[in-house]
A protein has these predicted regions:
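Charged, alpha-helix-forming regions
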Residues: 1-115, 121-164
Length: 164
């Protein structure tokens, strides 16, 4: 994976996490990093960052909760979109944990290992031979979520444009 794609995945990881004051405060720094990315990815990220900077924090939090927490079709636990509650999902979660551990990656949040921001952060820092299979494994789910977000005209759709 080239450095540009790593940067994109790292930025999207940060922007897909629950919005707090620290995210809003760091928007200008994130915007500088996004400005270094060529092409359409830059424009999509800058469009989302414009929304982030113009929207009051409480409204950002309400939109995030309404979009990802109250809508099962958009939950950020990516294996749910592939397997639902099937036992294969449990196997996938165990495999993700194993992948993280073998790569020396510390899961530093209280989410399940399939939490999309965590997967994206991992892909942005891990060796290509480890991250590329995850992109391949869940690329269809990234596209599906992007399509669903576009259908409801969510500002978060811009972030999924750069993942596929």
């Amino acid at each position: 994976m080239d450095e540009e794609k790593r940067l994109v995945f790292g930025l999207v990881s940060r922007l897909l996490d629950y919005p707090g004051k620290d995210l809003v405060d760091s928007a200008a720094d994130i915007e500088q990093w996004a400005g270094k990315i060529p092409g359409g990815s830059r424009e999509s990220l800058l469009d989302f960052l414009s929304y982030l900077r113009k929207t009051p924090l409480i409204d950002l939090q309400e939109e995030y909760t309404r979009t990802f927490d109250h809508n099962p079709g958009l939950c950020l636990n990516i294996t749910f979109h592939k397997w639902g509650e099937d036992k294969k999902r449990g196997t996938a979660l165990a495999e993700l944990t194993k992948t993280y551990n073998e790569a020396g990656y510390e899961m530093n949040c209280k989410e399940l290992p399939d939490y999309l921001p965590m997967i994206l952060e991992f892909i942005s820092v891990c060796p290509e031979e480890t991250g590329f299979p995850l992109q391949e494994e869940y690329g269809e789910q990234f596209a599906l979520m992007g399509s669903r977000l576009r259908a409801i005209q969510s500002p978060y759709a811009k972030l999924f444009e750069v993942l596929i």
